[in-house]
Amino acid sequence: MATVLSRALKLPGKKSPDLGEYDPLTQADSDESEDDLVLNLQQKNGGVKNGKSALGDLPEPDSDADVAGAAKPHLSEVTPEGFPSEPLGGLEQKATSPLVSYVRTSVFLLTLVISMVLVLLCAFLIPCPPRDLHSAWSRRLGSQGGGDLSPLELADVNRDGLRDVLLTFVTTRNGTEGGVGSQPTADLVCLSGMNGSTLWSSPLPEEAQDVTCLDLIPGSVAKTICLVTGTRKMLSAFNATSGKVLWTLNPNHLSNGTLAAPVVVLPDLDEDGVRDLVVLAIGELQPDLCFLLVSGRTGSPVGRPVKYNIVGVGNLIGPQVYITASGAVYILFGFGNIQAVALRDIFVQAQNRDSSPPSLQIEEPEWEKHRSVNLSELIDVYSDGVELLQLVKAPDSNSSSLLITTRQGLVLLRGQDLTPHWKLNLQGLRSQPTPGYFTDDQTLDFLLQTQDGDGMKKMTVVDGGSGSIVWSYSIPCHMKETPTTSAITSDQKSVFLFWAEALTAASLSSDDSSGAEPPGLYHLYLLHPAFPSILLDLSNTTGIVTASEVGINDIWKDAFYVTRTTGMSPEGHPTSLVVSKLSLRWALMEGQMVQLKETTPKIGRGELRRFLSRIKFVDSPYQI
């Protein structure tokens, strides 16, 4: 208050004392904060300095007000040192910040909504792969009216990711004309791999000996074609999706013989973009063997028939196509022996010309050395009581090895030079060996079944690298021939499947093959290389198993086992035909463990189940 009174008494225009002198009123003004508040109120209310408005002209530099202002700046005008003063537009920026935040939030929510809509559209427009919900199904196709052959093929005909089942069978239908009686008819049927329902059916003019489904146009997404070879003169191509006939070979081209073996697929010979075919016909006399090249696009012959006079004793071998590492193409065939003829020679004779396509002009020097006579077209491959011939993948090579089943045992020939890799003497071997991976050397091994006394069979696994026996066991089985199959897992091991009668505790501990169950009940057993002392009992049937195939569900890494069984009448004739499917991953969890022998440490069921639950199956062909 003293400061206010002192300033009020001062006359206008009077000079203030010298700044160097001590003024108690001025000193009190600088020490008391209350006076600062009063001055602030005066300035806000438009107070007058030296008779002038605060917004008017600047006061004189030597006025008392300037001296006081210089001694003590106004608090609202003080700017801390090191901090810039706020621009005048700061209020406008603060006012627009809520709008920016609103825009950002709106953009984020809009992006989120669009992403959710796209995800939902993809979920509805792109269907999920169908899951094979049927772990097992069985389909009865009625009474079978004869027929000794049991063709069975797996192919995905409806493009749903699951392989379907194709088979042919003979049925008996009543005659329509006075007392003619019943007459057999053949049918080609396609069953859904999902549930066993019939996708399509097509009649056949005769019984079929083989059904093969493949794509004749390499590297394309064309429709799958099924080639059906009859027992006499029929060769037809079917659209696997619809079951319609695409073409049929004119039987007049086989007037001098009948089809002796299933059709064989060749490279493209007529350069129309579709792989071609060859069939082997046999006349009434054995030496008359005839090769006929057939167009894969139209079913018309590619040239005239080519005849060879072959004399031999034993089973008909082949024909099979062998492509060497250098690209030379040979046809393997024979009677009780194996001979080869270059596809180039067949093509030149069929076309009646001297030249051949460049792809057929390649020769394999090691094979050419085995020609029986100079300038002869036939190459001697093997001639010692041949029963069966298989082409199997050779390790570390882009060619195949020749696995030959003879009356004396088993022989593996190297495909490069036709020299024996190993031989195994084994009597009683009649069925085809089943390839698979049992050992750890990534070389194909083979499961064999041989006769081992009355009502007994011995199952044997042979090492494909050395020809030595690595596993064997005798099982009770009264069926003469039972199919064996295998499936490869993701860790490059194979599971082997075979049929036998019940392996009870009594039959395991003694040589007596009679068990508690009747001999007409057969069980499906699985052998895994990781547990050679254990078999898994997966399923059983009372019928006669005539054919079986293993397919792979690539989407779910599962394998399924398809069987074709027939019942028997009291007179011994086949009756009803049944097709069954079994999911292997499901069966592994539900199967019963059969301990062949005691091991140390003992294998528990929990340990086995944990191991089996991790098994995944993959598609990897053993034969090429």
UniProtKB/Swiss-Prot annotation:
Gene: Fam234b
InterPro entries xrefs: FAM234 (IPR045232), FAM234A_B_beta-prop (IPR055409), Quinoprotein_ADH-like_sf (IPR011047), WD40/YVTN_repeat-like_dom_sf (IPR015943)
GO CC term (a single one): membrane
Protein name in the entry: Protein FAM234B
In-chain residues carrying the UniProt-annotated modification Phosphothreonine: T26
Lineage per the UniProt record: Eukaryota, Metazoa, Chordata, Craniata, Vertebrata
Transmembrane segments: 107-127
Residues bearing PTM Phosphoserine: S16, S30, S33, S63
Transmembrane recorded as keyword: yes
